[in-house]
């Protein structure tokens, strides 16, 4: 179970799909509440900053779809849920963040929190591609007539090829003996695509290598004091040499996997990075040019005690140094989860919603993470 306590092994991805449609948190949680009298949803708006009176957050200033500036006042608290990029961006625009950086941007400092925008974590991703010897890949299904047929089936029945993202199979593995729980994730796709996500014009498949416990840390910084300017995102993928070593191990593990007899009828030549790419220098060159993101950005407003210099929120998600403000999204994770972040973020939000409402928590469960009995001596 990629989201459970026993993660190690091969399995099928859980997906938030309902009746053939991708089911976002908005559809699952917001749509059923749209009719509530105490809920107003404002779309196509850009929040400029949080309003503060002294050290208390009193509301938000935003520009609506017509270009008018609107002050929304809070009766109790403001909950910031703009994500691992948007939340630190808005905090800093509001004067909550690293003092030196805010002053350099000409922003008055309301709370000096050095950790805002720091500690950026993600799951770096690298793809290996192989020719498929059997005509079983999805390549023919990318032809116009096939896509029309798949679309019609989805419209009528809500199933078929259009009801999946086709990342069905996943493996969570330990890179070597001594590693307690998975630090690599392999995601298998029945089609290979180029850098622009256009399908290769042949039967092929690809396997993604994801670093689940990367050591490198990035940051989010302001580009200016203009809310419309996107922030600077420094991902810093593979900056730590340990991450390069782990990614190289992942590549070699994939090659070992597809060399097994079970793959012999399917696996053709390695398209990318190519079987000739073997040395550390050759692999590093490919990693430098082709490492990408699994879009699991997190940890830029991390939770921790006030004694932690880089902590931004406390255990109830309240922002240190100010009152009337909580951050509720993946930015408050201290460390990125060693699996996909969607389910953990929803779990985090559900837990904090109970905390905000003052509901009694469920009875705690002491369920330790499963470890292979021989993990100290064997990789598998």
Write out the residue ranges for each language-model feature.
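Glycine-rich nucleotide phosphate-binding loop and flanking beta-alpha elements
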Residues: 48-49, 85-87, 309, 334
């Amino acid at each position: 179970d990629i989201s459970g306590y026993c993660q190690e092994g091969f399995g099928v991805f859980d997906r938030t799909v309902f009746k053939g449609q991708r089911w976002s948190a908005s559809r699952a949680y917001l749509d059923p509440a749209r009719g509530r009298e105490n809920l107003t949803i404002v779309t196509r708006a850009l929040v400029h900053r949080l309003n503060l009176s002294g050290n208390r957050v009193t509301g938000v200033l935003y520009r609506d779809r017509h270009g008018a500036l609107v002050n929304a006042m809070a009766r109790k608290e403001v909950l910031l849920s703009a994500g691992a990029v948007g939340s630190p961006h808005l905090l800093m625009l509001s004067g909550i963040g690293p003092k030196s950086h805010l002053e350099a941007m000409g922003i008055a400092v309301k709370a000096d929190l050095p950790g805002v925008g720091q500690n950026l974590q993600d799951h770096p991703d690298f793809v290996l591609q192989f020719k498929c010897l059997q005509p079983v890949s999805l390549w023919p299904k990318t032809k116009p007539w096939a896509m029309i047929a798949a679309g019609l089936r989805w419209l009528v029945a809500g199933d078929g090829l259009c009801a999946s993202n086709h990342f069905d199979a996943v493996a969570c593995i330990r890179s070597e003996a001594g590693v307690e729980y998975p630090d690599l994730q392999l995601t298998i796709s029945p089609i290979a695509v180029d850098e622009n996500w256009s399908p290769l014009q042949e039967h092929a498949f690809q396997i993604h290598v994801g670093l689940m416990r990367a050591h490198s840390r990035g940051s989010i910084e302001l580009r200016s004091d203009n809310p419309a300017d996107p922030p600077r995102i420094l991902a810093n993928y593979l900056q730590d040499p340990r991450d390069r070593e782990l990614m190289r191990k992942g590549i070699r593990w994939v090659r070992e996997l597809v060399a097994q007899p079970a793959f012999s009828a399917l696996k053709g030549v390695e398209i990318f990075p190519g079987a000739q790419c073997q040395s550390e220098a050759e692999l590093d060159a490919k990693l430098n040019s082709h490492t990408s993101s699994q879009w699991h950005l997190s940890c830029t407003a991390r939770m921790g005690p006030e004694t932690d210099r880089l902590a931004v929120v406390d255990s109830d998600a309240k922002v240190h140094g100010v009152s009337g403000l909580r951050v509720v999204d993946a930015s408050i994770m201290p460390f990125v989860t060693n699996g996909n972040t969607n389910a953990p973020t929803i779990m985090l939000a559900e837990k904090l919603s109970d905390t905000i409402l003052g509901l009694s928590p469920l009875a705690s469960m002491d369920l330790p993470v499963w470890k292979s009995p021989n993990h100290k001596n064997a990789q598998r």
